[in-house]
């Protein structure tokens, strides 16, 4: 992440290079045929451990809540820890066996992959799209947050009810929706639309998610530049989250929270599909394993719960490393998901609604290190105003504006 964030205070390289792979040829196989072709051996894994260990990670969680969130640096932050270990026989057969098990266990993953980077390998089943754009310019983002760790027998109605009525889990999801609305408000030609919420059920976890859709005329490079990185793996506001990560991260993030993307060139345009690199195992040339996971920390977080959430997120990879694959379970809780939508602003969920009246004139929004300004801009444009956003406006600019809006930013509102 640090290589992409050169302009942020978090410039801290971890030795993980940006990699572009030119596809010379491709072959498409059905999931069923691929599963038949892949090997299935039990990998020899040893020295499994968490870095940092539970107690140390819990102390870190408390420091971030008490000092960074309470101190006004931001509303939520994601700090990773890693499951570490050693692959006894680091062979392609072992790697493909892990990939096969993830493919079997996690049919709901957005993208499942084995990717040879030259010096290391990434194997993962990511639940989360980063951004997708088709050749016509239709664009989608997929904020996911909130985690229900299933019981050993699978998800239950009682467990789903407790999860979907938990205010902390609801607030976590709404925070990341706001952050990705900021991104799409910056990228899209017109206001983006919210679809959802939905339950994203994985083999051993359930998350909640929304889809945000819109249309853009931006090129791929600008879409990636303006959308990196997802708040679900970093926090918000994004600038503050970079700073907190630089201060608090115990181990290098490497590819955690980056993206694995595919760009295709068509006669009528360029398309992009990408997944966030979470739930991803990195294996280096010596067979060292690294599986980073994180928890979203908010003011109401409890250290013990966040520690448990991170260990819960390693259950699938532990099963892929040590157990035969198992199937998933049916979803529950659709009515409770629908109730969550009641708290969302209709501007983002019902784009067909016309404003009760239109305005004219010029609005100037002062940007104070929080991209909520771009959401405000889309709302004011919808009302008929001509809007400009500036982080350092001249006094004359403010004088000429019919409406001056001071955008939000980091800090403690009680100061």
Feature names for model-found ranges:
Residues 1-89, 93, 189, 195-198, ...:
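Non-catalytic accessory segments adjacent to catalytic cores
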Residues 25-48, 86, 148-151, 155-246, ...:
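Contiguous alpha-helical scaffold segments within structured protein domains
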Residues 78-171, 186, 263-293:
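An anion-binding catalytic pocket shared by soluble metabolic enzymes
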Residues 79, 175-177, 365:
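Short hydrophobic beta-strand that contains or immediately precedes a catalytic carboxylate
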Residues 213-334:
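Conserved hydrophobic core element of enzyme catalytic domains
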Residues 250, 324, 360-365, 369-372:
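Hydrophobic multi-pass inner-membrane translocation pores used for secretion
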Residues 330-368:
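RNA-binding accessory domains that recognize and position tRNA/RNA substrates
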Residues 362-363, 370-415:
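Flexible gly/pro-rich beta->alpha loop and the following alpha-helix that scaffold active-site loops
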């Amino acid at each position: 992440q640090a290589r992409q964030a050169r302009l942020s205070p978090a410039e801290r390289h971890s030795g993980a290079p940006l990699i572009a792979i030119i596809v010379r040829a491709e072959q498409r196989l059905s999931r069923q045929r691929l599963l038949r072709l892949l090997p299935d051996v039990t990998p020899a894994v040893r020295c499994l451990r968490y870095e940092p260990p539970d107690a140390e990670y819990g102390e870190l969680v408390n420091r971030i809540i008490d000092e960074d969130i309470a101190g006004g640096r931001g509303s939520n932050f994601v700090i990773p820890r890693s499951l570490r270990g050693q692959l006894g026989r680091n062979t392609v057969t072992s790697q493909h066996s892990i990939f096969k098990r993830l493919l079997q266990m996690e049919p709901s993953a957005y993208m499942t992959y084995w990717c040879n980077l030259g010096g290391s390998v990434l194997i993962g089943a990511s639940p989360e799209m980063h951004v997708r754009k088709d050749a016509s310019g239709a664009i989608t983002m997929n904020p996911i947050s909130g985690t229900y760790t299933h019981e050993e027998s699978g998800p239950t109605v009682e467990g789903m009810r407790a999860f979907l009525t938990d205010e902390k889990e609801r607030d976590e999801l709404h925070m990341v929706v706001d952050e990705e609305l900021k991104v799409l408000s910056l990228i899209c030609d017109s206001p983006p639309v919210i679809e959802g919420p939905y339950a994203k059920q994985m083999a051993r976890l359930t998350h909640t998610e929304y889809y945000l859709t819109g249309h853009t005329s931006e090129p791929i490079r600008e879409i990636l530049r303006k959308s990196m990185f997802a708040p679900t793996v970093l926090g918000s506001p994004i600038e503050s989250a970079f700073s907190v990560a630089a201060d608090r991260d115990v181990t290098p993030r490497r590819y955690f929270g980056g993206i694995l993307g595919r760009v295709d060139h068509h006669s009528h345009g360029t398309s992009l599909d990408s997944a966030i690199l979470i739930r991803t195992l990195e294996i280096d040339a010596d067979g060292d394993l690294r599986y980073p996971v994180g928890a979203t920390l908010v003011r109401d977080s409890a250290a013990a719960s966040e520690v448990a959430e991170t260990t819960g997120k390693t259950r699938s990879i532990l099963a892929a490393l040590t157990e035969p694959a198992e199937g998933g379970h049916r979803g529950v809780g659709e009515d409770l998901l629908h109730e969550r939508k009641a708290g969302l602003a209709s501007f983002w969920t019902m784009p067909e609604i016309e404003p009760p009246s239109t305005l004219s004139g010029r609005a100037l929004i002062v940007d104070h290190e929080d991209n909520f300004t771009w959401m405000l801009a889309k709302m004011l444009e919808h009302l008929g105003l001509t809007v400009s956003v500036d982080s350092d406006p001249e006094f004359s600019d403010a004088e000429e504006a019919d409406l001056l809006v001071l955008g939000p930013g980091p800090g403690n509102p009680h100061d």
